[in-house]
């Protein structure tokens, strides 16, 4: 067996996350350790990019904090991620939504895809 695959399986977290794509609005709950205290912080925003494959897969989430856009990159297999929740399913035609960086206000909205539950 390949040594890389053995190492990937050893460090895999084994968590099951929902499937999502660029344009979806997600809430990521991740653990933050400050000194000897640990807390869970929620980060809600639009997925603008999914990159990599396997255990190196990562996604970028963009949110507006006041008037400043904040982007954060999360590795999918990170042990610090508690959960990922898909809030809205977006309707976009691109895999990488870098054009959202230049848009502000209502122009930066993404159409919502209706999902039958």
From Swiss-Prot:
Keyword Ribonucleoprotein attributed: yes
UniProt GO molecular function: structural constituent of ribosome
InterPro entries the UniProt entry points to: Ribosomal_bL19, Ribosomal_bL19_CS, Ribosomal_bL19_sf, Translation_prot_SH3-like_sf
Family of this protein: Belongs to the bacterial ribosomal protein bL19 family.
Biological role: This protein is located at the 30S-50S ribosomal subunit interface and may play a role in the structure and function of the aminoacyl-tRNA binding site.
Protein name listed in UniProt: Large ribosomal subunit protein bL19
PROSITE patterns xrefs: RIBOSOMAL_L19
Pfam family, one: Ribosomal_L19
Gene3D superfamilies: 2.30.30.790
Database matches in SUPFAM superfamilies: Translation proteins SH3-like domain (SSF50104)
Biological processes, Gene Ontology terms: translation
Keywords from the named record: Ribonucleoprotein, Ribosomal protein
Keyword presence, DNA-binding: no
A cellular-component GO term for this protein: cytosolic large ribosomal subunit
Biological source species: Bacteroides thetaiotaomicron (strain ATCC 29148 / DSM 2079 / JCM 5827 / CCUG 10774 / NCTC 10582 / VPI-5482 / E50)
């Amino acid at each position: 067996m390949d040594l890389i695959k053995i190492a990937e399986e050893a460090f895999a977290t084994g968590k099951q996350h929902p499937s999502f794509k660029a344009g979806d609005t997600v809430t990521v709950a991740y653990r933050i350790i400050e000194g000897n205290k640990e807390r869970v912080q929620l980060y809600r925003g639009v997925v603008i990019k999914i990159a990599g494959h396997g255990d190196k897969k990562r996604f970028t989430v963009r949110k507006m904090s006041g008037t400043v856009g904040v982007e954060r990159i999360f590795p999918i297999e990170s042990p610090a991620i508690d959960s990922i929740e898909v809030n809205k399913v977006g309707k976009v035609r691109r895999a990488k939504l870098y054009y959202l960086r230049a848009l502000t206000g209502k122009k930066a909205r993404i159409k919502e895809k209706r999902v039958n539950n």
